Amino acid sequence: MLNMGHEVVQGYIDSKNPFDSWISLSYSIAFWLSNRIFQQTRYNLGLSCGLCGTGFCIRTSVIKEIGWGATCLTEDLEFTMKLVLNDRKVSFCKKAIVYDEKPLTFIQSWRQRKRWMQGHTDCAIRYLPKLFKKAFKEADLKAFDCAIYLFQPIRFICFGMAMVFSWSEVVFPAVPFYIIGYAFSSEVWSIIVLVQLLFGPLVVLFDKKWDIKIILGFFIYPFYCFTWLPVTIAGIKDAGRKEWIHTMHTRDISIDEVERL
């Protein structure tokens, strides 16, 4: 893709250990969905995709011109924002597959995702004003899209709270916490819920991830999504801290095993 004129290219982040634990499977599902829904969609629309910390390449001319200069805990996200502010973007190559190792335990996952949210919040503080200024002053849709993406921690909190309220109404039906259920008929809500339940598995199956374990993984995936609520709150609270906690990688796997995934 560099020969086609692209300056920064992110590859497809796959998993080399999706079935080692419920955490590694949930991570894998999240990245499979992101590859198709976030990365491929933005590439098709001409927007900027996002760097993922591994499996990407950058033209040396870009580094020579704008430098690296990323200092927050999510330097991949920060450099993506820097590229967009300099009228560049990240492209996506779905055929360049990287088999990344996912965390095995919830503690490892907590530490890594908290670091992501610390860095994400730090990036939002640094780059939101600049991105919105560029978006409205220059009618730059890429900058606007990146600015909206930096609200991700807030979205995680809102999504988590919505799940809490929904489950609370199931347990305590006589005590309604919100009345959004009255906005549509029960039939419409049934369709919305059905689409939400089927959308993720269909996206993964569309990418030819045919395995009953993956389908079963979608039953625990909502719980993984819910854990983003406390992780995000902790990350926002400690956004000013710069401590890097390394995520251990110990999984040995042969190329033959990878080809069977």
Question: For each predicted feature, which ranges?
Answer:
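Nucleotide-sugar-dependent glycosyltransferase catalytic core
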Residues: 102-117, 248-251
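Catalytic core of nucleotide-sugar-dependent glycosyltransferases
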Residues: 32-36, 111-131, 198-199, 231-235
